[in-house]
Amino acid sequence: MVKLMIRRLSSQVSKFVQPRLLETGTLRIALINCPNELSFCCERGFSAFSDRNLSYRERLRSGLVDIKADDAIDLFRDMIHSRPLPTVIDFSRLFSAIAKTKQYDLVLALCKQMELKGIAHNLYTLSIMINCFCRCRKLCLAFSAMGKIIKLGYEPNTITFSTLINGLCLEGRVSEALELVDRMVEMGHKPDLITINTLVNGLCLSGKEAEAMLLIDKMVEYGCQPNAVTYGPVLNVMCKSGQTALAMELLRKMEERNIKLDAVKYSIIIDGLCKHGSLDNAFNLFNEMEMKGITTNIITYNILIGGFCNAGRWDDGAKLLRDMIKRKINPNVVTFSVLIDSFVKEGKLREAEELHKEMIHRGIAPDTITYTSLIDGFCKENHLDKANQMVDLMVSKGCDPNIRTFNILINGYCKANRIDDGLELFRKMSLRGVVADTVTYNTLIQGFCELGKLNVAKELFQEMVSRKVPPNIVTYKILLDGLCDNGESEKALEIFEKIEKSKMELDIGIYNIIIHGMCNASKVDDAWDLFCSLPLKGVKPGVKTYNIMIGGLCKKGPLSEAELLFRKMEEDGHAPDGWTYNILIRAHLGDGDATKSVKLIEELKRCGFSVDASTIKMVIDMLSDGRLKKSFLDMLS
């Protein structure tokens, strides 16, 4: 396709600038097309160039860094009104400066105006246009501009080709970019390092790191030595996809090719190793950096500290903090936030508070993440008043609570049986512009279900759906469990049938809830049918599923059916647990078969389990009314 476009470039020259270019510009850009409005604009001053007596050439030399749109238009206006007219070289300087500020539409609009003034493009201005077209995702126009280059008799250079190649890569059209490289070589242009780096980056963005490596190796064969920039995208993709072993191999290959490695490349691999659980390897690589004289920075330390903390090795994370302070590398808010969060998760709230004080002492302002972690710690310790004080503090410091902050507080209220306070906070949340998410609704629905306030729970669920907050599998588990536990199994089955017909992937947990609900509602036969259908649905029953079904069969009777399933679960590779044995022991005791219960107790003990509180209570009750002999109690010890 690209080859065909290259061959047709010359025929497309007349259409290379479309009138619609100006449609994407600002009002100021649109005024350039209107002479009367332009005359009015001539009267106004401009911010960056206050000296009206400065010539446009002096301004071109002195003030084009980070040029603003209004200033660029003012300068362009002065240039087109100068006599004699400036050369195309002068205009190219202005266009280049504007392009560096990423105001690509403005460049294209001004190029059009220059052309209308009779100033012909040169290779440089057309190359700038190609870059702007590519950045604006207007590749057809970029190729048309290339056609104009060829028609005017200019020889496209490597930079021009590289710009087009980059444009194709930006749109994910890497195969076409590779074709253009072939065409470029046919025209006698050797791809340079910029071209290769562009292609490697494009291949990596498309998830084709293997092809990127082949391209690099081919490049070495042609005598073009890759640099650290070339390998960066490949290392990044490898580490993100968990291919840390390959990333390490590539690191060694880079060393063999005498490519200077820096902290950035090492940090990429260290980050990948941390995220995929290879903390010791990450720490070894960190030490290797030190031995090779590669200076570690705050980013490297933060990655490692985060890795250790996420793995629960907060002590190692704290050691690294002390080490970096000793090396005069100042920790930042990320460093402290990671450690504070880790201490909170480990239940070490006091240490987290000490770290908070330390960061304040060092003049480091906590952010929303820091405050939210501390609020989480207070909620876990049931210090809700302190949690609210922390919210007030963060707001006073200009940190807005986010949805996670509110979710933590609402969960804290629910755990403390202050669900009405949680609901009130939920209502106030929207006044702060914070939109509730699935976690928010799940927390409140669960809280009201546990209190038996099903009407409120159902209203919240309906509100959730109407506000287009997507319920997830956890939402349905909470709701179905609440309905079943509160005697509304029919409603639970109705909802279950709907989600079974949906595309949501259901796990064994949700089937356990429904089977248990059916058994409690004396629909054991229906529960059995659903249990037997699980393999056909591609769902494997677990030990808990068997226990629920055995319990249901025990309630329905006869016990022989429960015994058969008990033996079958072992045949199916599911070893019974203490709950399985206790269910059967109580069932046989209730049926008056103490002998069978004794055998099951002996088997239970051999398997390393013990009699639970429910079984002990049943035995004591039966002893007290004479249904069991006192000697039976000795069996339980």
UniProtKB/Swiss-Prot annotation:
Signal peptide: none annotated. Residues 1-95 form a transit peptide. Its main location: mitochondrion. InterPro entries: Mito_RNA-Proc/Resp, Pentatricopeptide_rpt, TPR-like_helical_dom_sf. It comes from the Eukaryota. Gene3D superfamilies: Tetratricopeptide repeat domain (1.25.40.10). Pfam families: PPR (PF01535), PPR_1 (PF12854), PPR_2 (PF13041). This is Pentatricopeptide repeat-containing protein At1g12300, mitochondrial. It comes from Arabidopsis thaliana. It is found in: Mitochondrion. GO terms for molecular function: RNA binding. Belongs to the PPR family. P subfamily. PANTHER family: PENTATRICOPEPTIDE REPEAT-CONTAINING PROTEIN 1, MITOCHONDRIAL (PTHR47933), PPR CONTAINING PLANT-LIKE PROTEIN (PTHR47933:SF2). One of its GO terms (cellular component) is mitochondrion. GO terms for biological process: mitochondrial mRNA processing. PPR repeats lie at residues 87-121, 122-156, 157-191, 192-226, 227-261, 262-296, 297-331, 332-366, 367-401, 402-436, 437-471, 472-506, 507-541, 542-576, 577-611. Keywords: Mitochondrion, Repeat, Transit peptide. The lineage of its organism: Eukaryota, Viridiplantae, Streptophyta, Embryophyta, Tracheophyta.
